[in-house]
Curated annotation (Swiss-Prot):
EC number(s) on file: 2.8.2.-
Oligomeric form and interacting partners: Monomer.
Record pathway: Protein modification; carbohydrate sulfation
Catalytic activity as recorded in UniProt: 3-O-{N-acetyl-beta-D-glucosaminyl-(1->3)-beta-D-galactosyl-(1->3)-N-acetyl-alpha-D-galactosaminyl}-L-threonyl-[protein] + 3'-phosphoadenylyl sulfate = 3-O-{6-O-sulfo-N-acetyl-beta-D-glucosaminyl-(1->3)-beta-D-galactosyl-(1->3)-N-acetyl-alpha-D-galactosaminyl}-L-threonyl-[protein] + adenosine 3',5'-bisphosphate + H(+); 3-O-{N-acetyl-beta-D-glucosaminyl-(1->3)-beta-D-galactosyl-(1->3)-N-acetyl-alpha-D-galactosaminyl}-L-seryl-[protein] + 3'-phosphoadenylyl sulfate = 3-O-{6-O-sulfo-N-acetyl-beta-D-glucosaminyl-(1->3)-beta-D-galactosyl-(1->3)-N-acetyl-alpha-D-galactosaminyl}-L-seryl-[protein] + adenosine 3',5'-bisphosphate + H(+); a 3-O-{beta-D-galactosyl-(1->3)-[N-acetyl-beta-D-glucosaminyl-(1->6)]-N-acetyl-alpha-D-galactosaminyl}-L-threonyl-[protein] + 3'-phosphoadenylyl sulfate = 3-O-{beta-D-galactosyl-(1->3)-[6-O-sulfo-N-acetyl-beta-D-glucosaminyl-(1->6)]-N-acetyl-alpha-D-galactosaminyl}-L-threonyl-[protein] + adenosine 3',5'-bisphosphate + H(+); 3-O-{beta-D-galactosyl-(1->3)-[N-acetyl-beta-D-glucosaminyl-(1->6)]-N-acetyl-alpha-D-galactosaminyl}-L-seryl-[protein] + 3'-phosphoadenylyl sulfate = 3-O-{beta-D-galactosyl-(1->3)-[6-O-sulfo-N-acetyl-beta-D-glucosaminyl-(1->6)]-N-acetyl-alpha-D-galactosaminyl}-L-seryl-[protein] + adenosine 3',5'-bisphosphate + H(+)
Keyword Phosphoprotein: no
Protein name: Carbohydrate sulfotransferase 4
Protein's organism: Mus musculus
GO molecular function: N-acetylglucosamine 6-O-sulfotransferase activity
Pfam family for this entry, one: Sulfotransfer_1
Length: 388
């Protein structure tokens, strides 16, 4: 009897040891998994359209020392197939972005001349602080705000393979892109297990976008032709800017509606941002952006954001981020566009304006009355995406 009791006791103690061992093993495994997840690179796509303030938002990320940033890598795809359409190029753009997110820069071989190349072969490479500092270029400290103008002079001759090295040395990879007119093309990236993708969807008042496009017509001529696609030959030249805006506005509507149909887990990887909200409260909105992707808002970046949005005038170059009064820039269409153009544009983009929270003006007097706030706080995005 005593032997039987001892045997049962030993079996009980043995089972407890096994349970404890399993618990320790599972705890260690969970801890290691969490640590691996925390080390996993974060991929961020700033999704926008032309002349919507996306260069500034790209710089908000790109100036952070933990970020590898590229501005519009899909430019290379579109400039290779200038006779194609945006819809036909979606797949090629998506595949290029996936490769760049994974720091595989060999994807550019299909869109660049063969043979040795420099990092200056990349479109707007000098906008990337990561390509202007170590390990790529030693002229600029990694923890200081980089100057694209000076970087272009000093760092352009670095070999192209340094781009991949720089990418792999950062924990965040951020790409800014304006050449997606549909969310459907992005679905494979959102569900790709090799990516940790977050999407920042930036929009801007279509009237401000239209005004800015008027000032950059020559620079955007190829992009506009690709957007218009088969409609290019059938639409009068004077109507083409409005039709291009109609397509762009519809794409923003489609993206927002598509996001609302995604599973909640994927919706949590999406952040909606209006340019006007950003320039009204740049520090608060930048804090929101950084929190969304897991970046710290460092003191020197807070100072830079304050200064770059509180400069004088309208800025020196349409495609560069420099000190300007960002709030005045966002309102410039109200005193510079004739009401006839505004009215025609509102007809083309009415659905997008209602959805995104931009109030229409019904007269020249309303347009010029700057005390009349045309930014609505009660819009569908505020109801669906309440974070921030």
């Amino acid at each position: 009897m005593m032997l039987l009791k001892k045997g049962r006791l030993l079996m009980f103690l043995g089972s407890q040891v096994i349970v404890v061992a399993l618990f320790i093993h599972m705890s260690v495994h969970r801890h290691l998994s969490q640590r691996e997840e925390s080390r996993r690179p974060v991929h961020v796509l700033v999704l926008s359209s032309w002349r919507s303030g996306s260069s500034f938002v790209g710089q908000l990320f790109g100036q952070h020392p933990d970020v590898f940033y590229l501005m519009e890598p899909a430019w290379h795809v579109w400039m290779t197939f200038t006779s194609s359409t945006a819809w036909k190029l979606h797949m090629a753009v998506r595949d290029l972005l996936r490769s760049v997110f994974l720091c595989d820069m060999s994807v550019f071989d299909a869109y660049m001349n063969p043979g040795p190349r420099k990092q200056s072969s990349l479109f707007q490479w000098e906008q990337s602080r990561a390509l202007c500092s170590a390990p790529v270029c030693d002229f600029f400290p990694a923890h200081e705000i980089s100057s694209p103008k000076h970087c272009k002079l000093l760092c352009g001759q670095q070999p192209f393979d340094m781009v991949e090295k720089a990418c792999r040395s950062h924990g965040f990879v951020v790409l800014k892109e304006v050449r997606f007119l549909s969310l459907q093309a992005l679905y494979p990236l959102l569900t790709d297990p090799s990516l940790n993708l977050h999407v920042v969807h930036l929009v801007r008042d279509p009237r401000a976008v239209f005004r800015s496009r008027e000032h950059t017509t020559i620079e955007l001529v190829v992009d506009s032709h690709i957007v218009l696609g088969q409609h290019l030959e059938t639409i009068k030249e004077e109507d083409q800017p409005y039709y291009a805006m109609k397509i762009i506005c519809k794409s923003q509507v489609d993206i927002v509606k598509a996001i609302q149909t995604l599973p909640e887990a994927l919706q949590q990887r999406y952040l909606f941002l209006r340019y006007e909200d950003l320039v009204r409260a740049p520090l608060a909105q930048t804090t929101r952006l950084y929190k969304f992707v897991g970046l710290d808002f460092l003191p020197h970046l807070q100072t830079w954001v304050h200064n770059v949005t509180r400069g004088k005038g309208m800025g020196q170059h349409a495609f560069h981020t420099n000190a300007r009064n960002a709030l005045n820039v966002s309102q410039a269409w109200r005193w510079s566009l004739p009401y006839e153009k505004v009215s025609q544009l509102q007809d083309a983009c009415g659905e997008a304006m209602d959805l995104l929270g931009y109030l229409q003006v019904r007269s020249q007097q309303e347009q010029g009355n700057l005390s009349l706030d045309l930014l609505s706080s009660s819009h569908i995005l505020g109801q669906v995406f309440r974070e921030g």
